Amino acid sequence: AVGLDSSTHTGTLTKNSDGTYTPSSAQDAKVLILPNKLAIAATKLTINGTDRYTLVVGVPTTTNNVQFSDIAGTYNYVSLQCLTVACNNSTGAPESAYGTFNITTSGSWVECTRSNYTASPTNCAGRDSGALNLLGNGKFQITSASSTNLGTAMFYHSPTGQKIMVIDLKNYFGSYGRGMMFGVPQVAANLGGDLDGTYHWNTTLGNSGSVSTSGANYTFSGGETGTMIADTPWLGMVDAAGGYAMMADEGVYMFTSKSLANDTYLVIGSKEQ
């Protein structure tokens, strides 16, 4: 978060009946935890007199020798980025997006904005590319084709093949900007079965809630209901409620608007355990 480099805060977490946690320093906030996989929280920052909210997402620290082969594959992702100085000064709005991110076993990467790498690896829309550098402890530096440092990637991966990608984008205006990107492997969205359940979420707008799914049907905590279309606009994505979602076997829930007019936020959540 802007201006918070190296800052630390401490407190305690109280577990709620719905499986979420409340931090002692923010009684109206929720912390979402997938044990040994992922932690999702949110924080409010006052910048130039304007309240701004950001998500805080982390994966377990590992001392294992994580290699490119461990994280290789194609990921579906959602992201939120500040592309201008005005955005970082709270006089402009961030931009959310969705797309695909491919990593090879040699550490090269290709990103396709609002398009599917698998369908067109060499000329997908919004194509960008570069390389990853090993930093150790499950972290990787992301560099552009011109060797510009774009940020840091962290990965959860398990022996069973589950993966979660978390990318912290640094201050690099004119390309990816400052922000965040989250992804899960591109696999078929088999609605129902293990994907059924309740997912708690936090947003970059400063609110939280939950959505329950059963097959192709969903119900938000506020009472809104609807249906989902699996593998739309491509494999692993889900068309629902005016946006695109991902509900992964890893227990992760992600959502962002598919309308460019409303692409100023994203939602990250986890399945109730």
Predicted regions and their residues:
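Mature soluble binding/inhibitory domains
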Residues: 1-273
